[in-house]
């Protein structure tokens, strides 16, 4: 699996990625798990170390809006965010590839001991949600049904 990914624990306050321009990507099992983007995000977390985090993933950084809303509604929860910027956009990929990508990311998030996962990607929610819900022993939520309410 080649390419860059954006993986971050989400912390309270402003996170200026420009300040990381000269940083080197961290490697996890010889894969790069985050990349530098010249953007500014306002992301929120109340660091509660007594509970497992909620994992959130998207095909890029758009899921940070979902993460922000989770933190607004559940201020005592921790969040681990994974943005798959290496393979964005998902809309042009096959269903089998979307399911494969989702499985890989869920396995990674499980290594971070998350207690639930939110698939913040519409494409992955539509194509992979039912499959991964059956395969993994962790609550997995998509964004299509909650967004339609």
Residue ranges and their predicted role:
Residues 5-7, 11, 15, 28, ...:
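Aromatic (phenylalanine/tyrosine) cluster motif
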Residues 33-34:
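Tryptophan (W) side chains
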Residues 41-149:
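Non-catalytic structural scaffold of enzyme domains
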